[in-house]
């Protein structure tokens, strides 16, 4: 069947490809069953120090490049893409137009020397990142090291929860709590609390005090609007803690060993831990998925997948499907058997059972997924296939690959995102 007959959509997709040092952007236009690929002009490398390189913010409605100067904090819009612009890790606030850009600091100390000296690293907040009206709102110094972000907000079951941003700090073993309600001017985009994740009894050295830095190594941070709690995974201790956003206190602690990250289902009912077993079998990496029920406080679902290392996770618009991309990990012998090009699709309506309904082999690892949604339903899913420089287009209902589009030269990293869409 002709792809245009199967799903008569007109869409424009942006495709970033890079090698962690330099990159470029292609634009994929699909209309009337035909696809055209164009490339943004490239600006030579800036040759600036790493912390001074321009930060890539997004693209405008007119396909111009939005950049943030990390020194002057000015937003610049231009037609060309600086080859060494930094594609920072971004977390989007689900209830506003604000995006949060993570700065993990330098590798040696975890400090953002430009903004925070030797006192930590930072997050920067920009509004309207897909518009020529993009606005820089501020840079906030937090703890040191790699960050993750979660955003709390009021819901029907937790109406008193405030709008707050939680930022985990890997090297410090802390969480920075930041006001995220512009109506509360005194706290807005300011650190209002720091949560020390130390568990003294699990520290190999120390005097039993609540030390920071510590070995909590937080990596896995989510908010459930159903329970009204924040869930943080302490990788160093093998525990998951529950935080009350009304007072930022740790109110529960659960053993949760063998996991390296968390994600939460769109309805907030289940927190899913993902991890990998590289020790029990010298020839195989075994992916691990554990389903924690926020209402019962139990873990009723556990799944293992041989020769899989989970990379990124995504949900469809309905919240009925989970998509997991895969990557490389393990010893050379284990990597011989690893399915690094797999895209796994699960039926979330079967939870707490992790029901796998489709496995695609894309030919290489997916760099990212993007979703075309209509009236609250996912019509198409796009996978940026980094090493091949292609995009796989997947039907959101049948889960079948509709077509694969050649976009650019392959590279180690890629990211695709939707710029516009409508039905023809």
PLM feature spans:
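Predominantly soluble domains enriched in secretory-pathway, periplasmic, or organellar proteins
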Residues: 1-424
